[in-house]
């Protein structure tokens, strides 16, 4: 990893490591035969994950039902996040982004339809945000708030997570994260074809609740991104999939070069093909 961070710094860049625990979005073959863990023993419906167990043909299979995390499990995972943050800084990263979105473990606590716990980690919005807060607090204490960002996905249903009242839940999450003075909040918008726009009232509420740097990502191009920043909705715009097929994306945007399409079939499994083998623009 130090080779990567050194290379980024040599080019004058800043690099954060995105830290995530997938929770129930995995398979026993990927974790030494153990049963996956989650906020609750609720299987993610219609979700497949990539496995390569050395015996069967590598490919995508259905996830299994997870087991509900105990209090000791929760403490252990909080500690794992704390140590992961320290490891990232030691490896030369400038900071970390806590991936609390896209249906992964922390999102499985936040969203009401994935969390049916009856203890202090389930039920009310405050309770469902508790695990998020404990992880953030541990990482802030370990490496400093100015090195911690958080990614949320309020309106997606990725990997089977859905919240009954996303506006209320995620406005509360923004205000909660503001208490920890994290450096930024990164919000992933829904970005499938014909996806609805994120409500403007929600964006205004998040802007009011969170005083750090705001980043939005999802279906943005250079024009939409510039407009969002100019309107004060966000401070920065993130690009994900366009970067996969366009390793020189900033230059392509700056000079108006055409963007190469990515292959969606190679995004979530396999090796280098379709992930790190796209060329820079050659004219």
Task: Locate each region found by the language model.
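Flavin-dependent oxidoreductase catalytic cores
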Residues: 1-283
